[in-house]
């Protein structure tokens, strides 16, 4: 596909149309990395998520569900809720907290990206287990924040890939893709594995996702009250601060480029 304009219906109505100069505009770059496709439309202000992206998805994972919806919220509120465990006990007192911990995470920073680990209480079974071939499968939830708008989450029985597309300061379009877990030997998932993945996704949809959405929508509604000029984050929420620092850094770089005097001849 070279993007050239090949055909125009009723082209006699456009006698002076130069097809060679009216094709598609090429994008700057297309990168396939960690099972994700990154399309850079214009000259980038920096490497962004590609600066240090870990391996995330494998070829043997099967997509079994997808969803697209819009919410009247700012995308950052949803992102922030996935980057800390401070909210687990008050937000999920019956769904998640009985199986997890109160305000306990392991946070890793990877360039502008981050990975947040939410351990289940059953991880304590590994305390005295042999270190050889130790696996965290079904022992933790891992949220990989792909700077700035995406996340890849490994849950107990499935993966969730989420993309946010901001449409306004108070409206966001979300795309969600659910996949099976990787198979250790690289084979195809069985019907039993697929059934467990679907059951896990349904449980999350009926419980945690609804509880998170309620809190986020309440925060969004409260912003309009004017009672607070800003929100404060504690030391437990370092991944949120990391996201905002990198947003500020990249926006400052973009602003500098947009307001720099153009160079003659370029």
What are these model-predicted stretches?
Residues 1-40:
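Rieske [2Fe-2S] iron-sulfur-binding domain
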Residues 28-266:
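C-terminal catalytic domain of Rieske-type non-heme iron oxygenases
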């Amino acid at each position: 596909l070279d993007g050239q304009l090949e055909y125009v219906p009723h082209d006699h109505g456009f006698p002076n149309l130069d097809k060679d100069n009216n094709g598609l505009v090429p994008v700057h770059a297309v990168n396939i990395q960690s099972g994700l496709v990154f399309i850079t439309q214009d000259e980038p202000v920096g490497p962004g998520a590609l600066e240090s992206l870990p391996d995330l998805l494998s070829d043997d994972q099967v997509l079994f569900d997808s969803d697209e919806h819009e919410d009247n919220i700012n995308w950052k509120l949803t992102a922030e809720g996935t980057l800390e465990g401070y909210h687990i006990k008050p937000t999920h007192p019956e769904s998640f907290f009985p199986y997890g911990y109160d305000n306990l995470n392991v946070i890793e920073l990877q360039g502008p990206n981050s990975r947040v680990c939410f351990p289940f209480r059953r991880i304590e079974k590994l305390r005295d287990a042999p270190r050889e071939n130790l696996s965290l499968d079904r022992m933790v939830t891992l949220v990989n924040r792909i700077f700035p708008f995406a996340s890849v989450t490994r849950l107990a029985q499935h993966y969730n890939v989420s993309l946010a597309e901001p449409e306004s300061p108070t409206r966001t379009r979300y795309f969600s893709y659910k996949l099976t877990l990787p198979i250790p030997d690289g084979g195809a998932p069985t019907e039993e594995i697929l059934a467990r993945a679907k059951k896990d996704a349904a449980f999350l949809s009926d419980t945690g996702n609804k509880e998170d959405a309620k809190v986020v929508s309440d925060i969004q509604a409260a912003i309009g009250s004017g009672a607070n000029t800003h929100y404060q984050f504690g030391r437990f929420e370092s991944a949120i601060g990391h996201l905002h620092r990198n947003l500020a850094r990249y926006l400052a770089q973009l602003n500098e480029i947009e307001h720099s005097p153009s160079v003659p001849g370029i």
